[in-house]
């Protein structure tokens, strides 16, 4: 053993302490995953070495075969995992093994619930595989040297997984990392060749470099123990390069867990090889659950990029649009250069062609999932629906395809579940209906009881109910689907087209003529509060509503702009009244202009509240209402 120098004891970052505690308690039921996680890290270290050695061949230090070795010592109760990858310097070890230098750490910690299954998913997703060693070990030692550093700059890290760790400088002849797990009492099962072999076959068969175990060889009686020989126990070939027919579902699932750092199986995947003008292979996965940082724009996203089976980068963002940022996978190109950079990726026309094809492949995969596994698609929509709604604005070429994948709540159901596709809606449309009607609002309770829906209920016309914050913005980009245009039922002067009979239209015009005087009186009373007053075609039960001008921003968009501190363009609502409602008839007969004004303002404020808006002067509303109540009680 080499002499240790510059030895120091350091404390773990607070988050690491919490994480170690959670690791040991949340993942205990599936403790064998520690080996999968450590092998996955070792594989990444070898990938990084391969890539760095393209420009600095001297890092290979003589060019021994790249591999991972797993060994054990029954007597000492240890399991050792060794790779000859990129290795770590003293600084790397302190940074990577003592702290979690990741954005989103606080969010991650907040999301932990104490529920074992949910937490294990989050922990895996956060990519903290090294700490899983403490599930089975009460002490972990790491011996490492970064490729390119002298042998005298090796490092030894050691911890019992409590509050601190020790780090020292050592001599280490070979580059790479060796991890020694000192097994806890009762975990001796892992110091066994057969058990380790089974775990490797189960979880890490897809790893594209050899994973070796010592050959089991017993000495004959009276003979010396044979020299240690190693044998490869995994396939050691890149999964995406193999024919689809040879790959089992379980292999696809384990590969997903390796690249996505997820503990759950994916919902779906698509494996494809393209030959011809462009040559590349892709393996794309739809996760079962959303990552905790899905809405953080700076969160890592993108595919693993390989060029001719050599790893080039993680999180290559240029191959898929932002609204598909949740997709995990691998793309392996024969056409790109090995020294490709992120900047080059953003400008390369080859990438544009690949992005277009990969985007279509993902959308096809989602269409298939929606058609063949509607229950699974429901789960997908709950997790990723809001992100998919970013699609029509970002990806004009696939707008119709994305629209077909969207799901909405509607007046057809009464639970607010977003399970209606646009194809479902059109299949149920009334004869002669050439529009898709929708209403946006802050909550399902608010929109489903909106007075704007009264005429639609009366005529049995389905209306989509949109309550996500992104919905009004989405609909500004979604103009039509399958040749049918979208109509906001709260906007402009509602025209039901063929769904209104000529008699109904004529009768409405006659009523509007007879109420011209009332229209003028209300307009005078409400003054600058409104842009227009008119007789409503939408109402059957309520006395009045506020409609939005054809070119004006809706309530949702106004609130989003206000919340972000942006200037909101001035706009005034249109006041529509129901001429047959008893309150409007009373208003029409009111002789006192003062009382007429009070009643008009009360109706206006009530219509604003029904639309989900806040009152500009709540005190004035209360004063008028109290005055009216006093008059009624006399």
From Swiss-Prot:
Its main location: cytoplasm. Disulfide bonds: none annotated. Residues 343-559 are annotated as: B. Pfam families: HATPase_c_3, HSP90. Residues 560-634 are annotated as: C. GO terms for cellular component: cytoplasm. InterPro entries: HATPase_C_sf, Heat_shock_protein_90_CS, HSP90_C, Hsp90_fam, Hsp90_N, Ribosomal_Su5_D2-typ_SF. It is found in: Cytoplasm. Molecular chaperone. Has ATPase activity. Homodimer. This is Chaperone protein HtpG.
